[in-house]
Amino acid sequence: EKHAALILGQGLASLGDRFEIGGFSSNGHENCHYFIYKDFEQEWDRQSITRVLAATPAESTRIGPALRHSGYRLERIEARQRLIIVVTDGKPMDSGYDPNSRYAQHDIRMANEENARLDIHTFGISTEANTVADMEIMFPRRRFAILPDIRKLPRILPQLYIRLTV
């Protein structure tokens, strides 16, 4: 994912598009963290690249709050289009989620619907850990891709961005 973020960041910077690269982790609903590696106002420079490269996986994957926070930040940005691309290598899971329920998937869907009301659109990219049925709940209207090989992400992500924004 880091390599893909670096490639996309370089491409967006060369296009002159404003962008943010963030990450998130959680340990229960009261302990959600959102990390900013490159914010909208920062230049894409050596420091931004270093922060992306220093990112490490941590704790659990409570995606709904991260989407809401991304939407909150993006809502304040003047842009012709506002897009959130979520890249995940696993199912949404956290303490407090019943693994037999689809609560996490429905929370992501609700966060996407909340952002859509603000004219912010989301696209999800996942490994095969999520099924088509899971992804259709989280990212309705086929606004998702499932990659059988995450190593293809650096090649696919720039093409996807162009498709979503043109």
Model-flagged regions — what are they?
Residues 1-166:
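Acidic, glycine-rich A-domain
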